[in-house]
Amino acid sequence: MAIAYFIPDQAQLLARSYQQNGQQTAASPRTTATAAAPSQQQQQSQQQQQQQRHHHQQQRPQFRANISVPLGSQQGSMTMSEFGCWDLLAQIFCYALRIYSYSSSQRQPTVIQISFEISSGGQNNDEDDVTDATSKEN
């Protein structure tokens, strides 16, 4: 039986922490000196532009979910509905949509990329691998 580990609460907390950091940066007061020299005003405007660029970069939360699906020797006899991989992909996609459409006022075009990797768990598990087609000779 295949088991999938997916922790959506951590993903939601991650997205919210990025959003809260962005709101705190926007809410911080900026003071400017009225009697400052022109060179100081230019430096302050450059610093504000850099802060705005940095703030704009922080508004894009990036989220990565690592999902581990250990497959045993019984996986070959399981049907696709028993394995449930389509259900898992649908849950990941729907949850990603919820995270990125959290604030409808700042909604931007979003590309959601779901990728997966199939690899063996270890190098010494070749004897248990039912898909290994090579013959082993002593």
From Swiss-Prot:
Residues 21-71, 119-138 are annotated as: Disordered. Residues 23-51 have a biased composition (Low complexity). One of its GO terms (biological process) is programmed cell death involved in cell development. The keyword Cytoplasm does not apply. The keyword Glycoprotein does not apply. One of its GO terms (cellular component) is cytoplasm. Keywords: Apoptosis. One of its GO terms (molecular function) is protein homodimerization activity. It comes from the Eukaryota. Interacts with Diap2 (via BIR2 domain). Activator of apoptosis, independent of rpr and hid, that acts on the effector Dredd. This is Cell death protein Grim.
